[in-house]
Amino acid sequence: MAQENAAFSPGSEEPPRRRGRQRYVEKDGRCNVQQGNVRETYRYLTDLFTTLVDLQWRLSLLFFVLAYALTWLFFGAIWWLIAYGRGDLEHLEDTAWTPCVNNLNGFVAAFLFSIETETTIGYGHRVITDQCPEGIVLLLLQAILGSMVNAFMVGCMFVKISQPNKRAATLVFSSHAVVSLRDGRLCLMFRVGDLRSSHIVEASIRAKLIRSRQTLEGEFIPLHQTDLSVGFDTGDDRLFLVSPLVISHEIDAASPFWEASRRALERDDFEIVVILEGMVEATGMTCQARSSYLVDEVLWGHRFTSVLTLEDGFYEVDYASFHETFEVPTPSCSARELAEAAARLDAHLYWSIPSRLDEKVEEEGAGEGAGAGDGADKEHNGCLPPPESESKV
């Protein structure tokens, strides 16, 4: 609640209107989208490996157990059928009879022999003889198929274990985004950090604005995506993420927030999705971390608290202050109005020396121009920074 009050200026007529907007991307990076009424489910089977990797762990383990158990049962049944078809089960006590598999006296024995064959743990007193060509062919088929099942299932488990999803959990985003002046220009900023000592290689950052819009033809687009520039043209989107960094989106004429003042921003309805990508240094696999900011998570007139201090021979990062912000003097007008006010201020500096005739005309029109001047001053004052405050969030 303190954060919400800090974002509200006492000079405003009313606090920002709260909304129950449904997130498109959760704060932990999960995409809040479910695929429904998928009729062509056979497409999942065409990419069975990815389907198994994407399954939940309990389902993956269940499939892992079933894959081995069913193959053992299947080949065990075939071994039993071979013994039954050859009449081996009817000559169990006949020492002169040469069976296909020695000491295979029932289905349980055939099942155990199937396990011994596929897992290559070694035969005991059950062993195949050279008088059974169909058994030799089946032995070769089970050995080949067993190797394929092992490769497939072990590969699935390895990929599932080594997925970089957990690595993304140690990439953190600030709980709020802020809007304040940087080098005299309004900027939308958020902070990212890496909790691990091993770094993300080739890290890059992207930001997208998610909001609804209506086209000139009347088409309604509920989740229209717009890129927010975070330094693609200058290379600032390529990060050396050793310590926490503040990512800045300059609100210029190409920004969708160019005409958004503080009050307009608080009344707007949007979601900012931020995406951090890079390669895990230990494995070389691509990792992606995501987060998002709703309207009430964007603090106007705030700046992030510094978390980096210089100690004896090293820099120390204090993650206890990672999400903290503090208020700074920031204009409440839009970036466009701020640029226009700055342009008018620069124009006064280069005003030419008027002639006597111009002075006379100005004296005659002094009364008429007073009202317009007051209006311009009011407009300019709307872009002045608010009183400085030291309250922290």
Curated annotation (Swiss-Prot):
One of its GO terms (biological process) is regulation of presynaptic membrane potential. The chain crosses the membrane at residues 58-82, 135-156. This is G protein-activated inward rectifier potassium channel 3. SUPFAM superfamilies: E set domains (SSF81296), Voltage-gated potassium channels (SSF81324). GO terms for cellular component: inward rectifier potassium channel complex; parallel fiber to Purkinje cell synapse; presynaptic membrane. Residues 384-393 have a biased composition (Pro residues). It comes from the Eukaryota. It is found in: Membrane. Residues 1-57, 157-393 are cytoplasmic. Inward rectifier potassium channels are characterized by a greater tendency to allow potassium to flow into the cell rather than out of it. Their voltage dependence is regulated by the concentration of extracellular potassium; as external potassium is raised, the voltage range of the channel opening shifts to more positive voltages. The inward rectification is mainly due to the blockage of outward current by internal magnesium. This receptor is controlled by G proteins. Unable to produce channel activity when expressed alone. Forms a functional channel in association with KCNJ3/GIRK1. The keyword Transmembrane helix applies. Associates with KCNJ3/GIRK1 to form a G-protein-activated heteromultimer pore-forming unit. Interacts (via PDZ-binding motif) with SNX27 (via PDZ domain); the interaction is required when endocytosed to prevent degradation in lysosomes and promote recycling to the plasma membrane. A motif (Selectivity filter) lies at residues 120-125. The record marks N150 as: Role in the control of polyamine-mediated channel gating and in the blocking by intracellular magnesium. The lineage of its organism: Eukaryota, Metazoa, Chordata, Craniata, Vertebrata. Pfam families: IRK, IRK_C. It comes from Mus musculus (Mouse). Keywords: Ion channel, Ion transport, Membrane, Potassium, Potassium transport, Transmembrane, Transmembrane helix, Transport, Voltage-gated channel. Belongs to the inward rectifier-type potassium channel (TC 1.A.2.1) family. KCNJ9 subfamily. One of its GO terms (molecular function) is G-protein activated inward rectifier potassium channel activity. Expressed mainly in the brain, some expression in the skeletal muscle. The keyword Cell membrane does not apply. It catalyses: K(+)(in) = K(+)(out).
